[in-house]
Amino acid sequence: EELAVQVERLLTKRCIDLIALARRAGEAVAGYEKVRLWLRGRPNSLLVIANDGAKSSREKMKKFAYGVPLIECLWAAELGVAFGREKAIHVALGNCGLADKLQFEAQRLKGFRLEG
């Protein structure tokens, strides 16, 4: 079990670090309105929604961002770390190599969390 906890922690950290790097590069934003504006101007983006955000807010964003790749395996507190705040529910990344890497790592984390 100790190994499983460590693996999950490392996968989570990898995802958070990729989002933080994208933010520093100007390729990521957080917050409902910022994400909506971002997606309106950049339809080839990646959307990340905290899996513990309010259901109505998550569903509204999913409808707005229909067709945009979506990640939902991170908690609001985990996303918040990437932006230096307590929580972040909605995050968008530009169509960049970091988004591709994040999709890969998030898929690994999702599979691991489903198994664990």
Please report, for each region that a protein language model flagged, where it lies by residue:
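Charged, alpha-helix-enriched surfaces in structured cytosolic catalytic cores
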Residues: E2, R14, K55-S56, L74, ...
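Short basic, glycine-rich beta-strand/loop surfaces that mediate nucleic-acid
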Residues: V68-R108
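Active-site cofactor/cluster-binding pocket
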Residues: A25, K34-N44, K55-F64, A76, ...
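A short, gly/pro- and small-residue-rich
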Residues: S57-I71, L109-K110
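Extended interfacial segments that mediate partner engagement and assembly in macromolecular machines
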Residues: E1-V48
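Signal for well-folded cores of large energy- and translation-related assemblies
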Residues: A20, R40, K62, G84, ...
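Internal, active-site/partner-interface "lid" segment
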Residues: F112-G116
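Structural motif
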Residues: I49-D52, G94
